[in-house]
Amino acid sequence: MRKLDKVDIQLVKILSQNSRLTYRELAELMNTTRQRIARRITKLKKLGVIKKFTIIPDLDKLGYMYAFVLVKLRVPSEVDAMISEISNVEYVKEIEKGVGRYNLIVRLLLPKDLKEAEGIINEFLQKIKNAESVEVVLISEIKKFEII
């Protein structure tokens, strides 16, 4: 992968805060031209640095909450198989490999209704095979969320 410079990183940081800015607005913020911004964004997309432009919804207002499921597998080498097993589960929104106490960190999108959320969590936990330990953490409020 080609090395990114300070301008590329600054552009990604600005877009991660507001991806709706126009090329003109970005150019003004970065003291450059629209054409340079367009070329850099095209380059960043081709390199896979920018995967998509999206929004960050207010889950509380939509009636949802997050839960993190922290998993320590008995056989750490089976983490990729576990990822394949759970990747297509509808309410699984993020899967991360961990180094340290947990091999796997999974973010679930759950309804705020605790009975319904409990049912989904229990259903998900049935899919976790070969776990030495599992912890579930319900997220009551997100105080800060930044991508980069």
Swiss-Prot record:
Q: Pfam family of this protein, just one?
A: HTH_24
SMART domains recorded for this chain? HTH_ASNC (SM00344)
Instruction: Kindly give the PROSITE patterns that the UniProt entry links to this protein.
Output: HTH_ASNC_1 (PS00519), HTH_ASNC_2 (PS50956)
What's an example of a GO molecular-function annotation for this chain?
A: sequence-specific DNA binding
Sorted UniProt keywords: DNA-binding, Transcription, Transcription regulation
Q: Where is the HTH asnC-type domain?
A: 4-65
Residues in the DNA-binding region are 23-42
Report the InterPro entries cross-referenced here. AsnC-type_HTH_dom, Dimeric_a/b-barrel, HTH-Siroheme_Decarb, Tscrpt_reg_AsnC-like, Tscrpt_reg_HTH_AsnC-type_CS, WH-like_DNA-bd_sf, WH_DNA-bd_sf
The keyword DNA-binding appears for this protein:
yes
Q: Which PANTHER family match?
A: HTH-TYPE TRANSCRIPTIONAL REGULATOR PTR2, TRANSCRIPTIONAL REGULATOR, ASNC FAMILY
Protein name (Swiss-Prot/TrEMBL): Uncharacterized HTH-type transcriptional regulator PYRAB00690
Query: From which source organism is this entry?
Result: Pyrococcus abyssi (strain GE5 / Orsay)
